[in-house]
Amino acid sequence: MEYRVEHDTMGEVKVPNDKYWGAQTERSFENFKIGCEKMPKVLIYAFANLKKSLALVNNKLGKLDDAKKNAIVQACDEIIAGKFDDNFPLAIWQTGSGTQSNMNMNEVIANRATEIMGGDFRKEKLVHPNDHVNMSQSSNDTFPTAMSIVAVEQVEKKLIPALDELIATFEKKVKEFDGIIKIGRTHLQDATPLTLAQEFSGYLSMLLHSKEQIIASLPTLRELAIGGTAVGTGLNAHPELSQKVSEELTQLIGTKFISSPNKFHALTSHDAINFTHGAMKGLAANLMKIANDIRWLASGPRCGLGELIIPENEPGSSIMPGKVNPTQCEAVTMVAVQVMGNDVAIGFAASQGNFELNVFKPVIIYNFLQSLDLLADSMHSFNIHCAVGIEPNRAKIDHNLHNSLMLVTALNPHIGYENAAKVAKNAHKKGISLKESTMELGLVSEEDFNKFVDPTKMIGPKA
């Protein structure tokens, strides 16, 4: 491999000749060989959009000439298009401010912009990473701004569409399952009846509420730290920079961003991203419950509850022939566990904003994006490989319904709670039906029993 010599304020550094990064990126690459977690590509692209917006605004403010602005914008567009993905090698486990990733971006843009302007970045710097690309900025305000951009963008473009897809499927299932009466269960024990549509309407409502909660968390996430520079005072930044960059990003990305009204808050706290992830954790909890219920209701096929039939996607056992497992449900529940773990990490990291700067930024955004990707991908997978194919096992549903002792609840208004309990206990002890038990105890006539104990009349309130 051929190398060139780059330099920074600490001296000279050898850098692979085919790479566009510079000295500070190389130092980080060599100093932090920790784990395999790299800066997510979507974060890199959000950062490039930010640098593009800054170049445009600095040009409008008269601080950056047209030639450099045009070259920087083109370099950013190429990064966003994925042409330089292999030039962003840094680990998440680096400085907690994200400074080295900010400089990685600055160096790649500067060297590519120099090339665009006709220069050879290996010999000269027509565009400087600090003086031009990082003009009026600090890592302390650019990295959290990139975090906000990518978080909002991915929630809107990836998470919500995947959630909407699952919501649409459950809306269809509620309609399909209307009129199918089944036994309810509380405490893992038989309870009073409801319809399968009512049960699934609960799942649907949970998903709708999760969507509302996630969307409701976004307004403060749209507040950008840019313009705060090092500690929130805006030192070396034009007073109009923050507002103009927010407007530029809104136009560029197509979703609303605003300048944070308090830059000291924006640099030292990540409560907004913590709040949004909390809503995502709420979605994970709902998905855990829904997937668990569905796999229990589909358990069997002969010795379980067996009230639902789910798609058979692959063999389930390496030793038991013919076994099929609820694998999509299991994947969703594992994702939910991971998201809950990420929430703990994000919450603790967000609490560590010592003085003017939180220095846990990379791990916060990495875990946030991992949770978002896992939730979106698992919902899509669960939907197409399981949810759309869920069918009721009507024979098993009817069998379980009519063998449940909890239908005795319908007798409460007519013979009282204690007598109804005697009917249920007598039936259970002797292995007879509720009707037989009632007749044996002489509490109501057969005609009245048939009138009172009617599952179709037990699925809603009655005056």
From Swiss-Prot:
<feature type="binding site">
    <location>
        <begin position="138"/>
        <end position="140"/>
    </location>
    <ligand>
        <name>substrate</name>
    </ligand>
</feature>
<keyword id="KW-0456">Lyase</keyword>
<dbReference type="InterPro" id="IPR018951">
    <property type="entry name" value="Fumarase_C_C"/>
</dbReference>
<feature type="site" description="Important for catalytic activity">
    <location>
        <position position="330"/>
    </location>
</feature>
<dbReference type="InterPro" id="IPR008948">
    <property type="entry name" value="L-Aspartase-like"/>
</dbReference>
<dbReference type="Pfam" id="PF10415">
    <property type="entry name" value="FumaraseC_C"/>
</dbReference>
<comment type="similarity">
    <text>Belongs to the class-II fumarase/aspartase family. Fumarase subfamily.</text>
</comment>
<dbReference type="GO" id="GO:0006108">
    <property type="term" value="P:malate metabolic process"/>
</dbReference>
<feature type="binding site" description="in site B">
    <location>
        <begin position="128"/>
        <end position="131"/>
    </location>
    <ligand>
        <name>substrate</name>
    </ligand>
</feature>
<comment type="pathway">
    <text>Carbohydrate metabolism; tricarboxylic acid cycle; (S)-malate from fumarate: step 1/1.</text>
</comment>
<dbReference type="InterPro" id="IPR005677">
    <property type="entry name" value="Fum_hydII"/>
</dbReference>
<dbReference type="GO" id="GO:0006099">
    <property type="term" value="P:tricarboxylic acid cycle"/>
</dbReference>
<dbReference type="InterPro" id="IPR020557">
    <property type="entry name" value="Fumarate_lyase_CS"/>
</dbReference>
<feature type="binding site">
    <location>
        <position position="186"/>
    </location>
    <ligand>
        <name>substrate</name>
    </ligand>
</feature>
<comment type="subunit">
    <text>Homotetramer.</text>
</comment>
<dbReference type="InterPro" id="IPR000362">
    <property type="entry name" value="Fumarate_lyase_fam"/>
</dbReference>
<protein>
    <recommendedName>
        <fullName>Fumarate hydratase class II</fullName>
        <ecNumber>4.2.1.2</ecNumber>
    </recommendedName>
</protein>
<dbReference type="Pfam" id="PF00206">
    <property type="entry name" value="Lyase_1"/>
</dbReference>
<feature type="binding site">
    <location>
        <begin position="97"/>
        <end position="99"/>
    </location>
    <ligand>
        <name>substrate</name>
    </ligand>
</feature>
<dbReference type="GO" id="GO:0004333">
    <property type="term" value="F:fumarate hydratase activity"/>
</dbReference>
<dbReference type="GO" id="GO:0005737">
    <property type="term" value="C:cytoplasm"/>
</dbReference>
<dbReference type="GO" id="GO:0006106">
    <property type="term" value="P:fumarate metabolic process"/>
</dbReference>
<feature type="binding site">
    <location>
        <position position="318"/>
    </location>
    <ligand>
        <name>substrate</name>
    </ligand>
</feature>
<feature type="active site">
    <location>
        <position position="317"/>
    </location>
</feature>
<keyword id="KW-0816">Tricarboxylic acid cycle</keyword>
<comment type="function">
    <text>Involved in the TCA cycle. Catalyzes the stereospecific interconversion of fumarate to L-malate.</text>
</comment>
<keyword id="KW-0963">Cytoplasm</keyword>
<feature type="active site" description="Proton donor/acceptor">
    <location>
        <position position="187"/>
    </location>
</feature>
<feature type="binding site">
    <location>
        <begin position="323"/>
        <end position="325"/>
    </location>
    <ligand>
        <name>substrate</name>
    </ligand>
</feature>
<dbReference type="InterPro" id="IPR022761">
    <property type="entry name" value="Fumarate_lyase_N"/>
</dbReference>
<dbReference type="InterPro" id="IPR024083">
    <property type="entry name" value="Fumarase/histidase_N"/>
</dbReference>
